[in-house]
Amino acid sequence: MGMRMMFTVFLLVVLAATIVSFTSDRASDGRNVAAKAFHRIGRTIRDECCSNPACRVNNPHVCRRR
C-alpha cells in the first residue's frame, strides 16, 4: 500500500472510532436521564403517600425512614 492509501485508512479508522464513541456516550447519557427521572418519580410518589395519613398507614414500608 502506498503512503496515501495508508493515511486514508488511518483517517477512516479514526473517524469510525469517533462515531462509535460518540454514539455510545449519548446512549449512556440517555440511560442516566431515565434513571434520574425514575428516581424522581418514585420520590414524589413516596412523599405524597407519606404526607397522607391513610396512605402512610396502609403502606408503612414506603414511609420508612432510611
From Swiss-Prot:
| Signal peptide residue numbers | 1-21
Give the propeptide positions.
22-44
Summarizing the annotation, the consequence of altering V57S is: No change in inhibitory potency on alpha-4-beta-2/CHRNA4-CHRNB2 and small increase in inhibitory potency on alpha-3-beta-2/CHRNA3-CHRNB2
Q: Which residues carry this modification: 4-carboxyglutamate?
A: E48
Q: What is the effect of changing E48Q?
A: Loss in inhibitory potency on alpha-4-beta-2/CHRNA4-CHRNB2 and loss in inhibitory potency on alpha-3-beta-2/CHRNA3-CHRNB2
Changing I45A: what effect?
No change in inhibitory potency on alpha-7/CHRNA7, 4.6-fold decrease or small increase in inhibitory potency on alpha-3-beta-2/CHRNA3-CHRNB2 (depending on experiments), 2-fold decrease or no change in inhibitory potency on alpha-4-beta-2/CHRNA4-CHRNB2 nAChR (depending on experiments)
Keywords associated with the record: Acetylcholine receptor inhibiting toxin, Disulfide bond, Gamma-carboxyglutamic acid, Hydroxylation, Ion channel impairing toxin, Neurotoxin, Postsynaptic neurotoxin, Secreted, Signal, Toxin
GO molecular function ontology, one term from the record = acetylcholine receptor inhibitor activity
Q: Which family does it belong to?
A: Belongs to the conotoxin A superfamily.
Instruction: State the protein's purpose.
Output: Alpha-conotoxins act on postsynaptic membranes, they bind to the nicotinic acetylcholine receptors (nAChR) and thus inhibit them. This toxin reversibly blocks alpha-3-beta-2/CHRNA3-CHRNB2 (IC(50)=3.1-5.1 nM), alpha-7/CHRNA7 (IC(50)=4.5-5.1 nM), and alpha-4-beta-2/CHRNA4-CHRNB2 (IC(50)=128.6-390 nM) nAChRs.
**What is the recorded name of this protein?**
Alpha-conotoxin GID
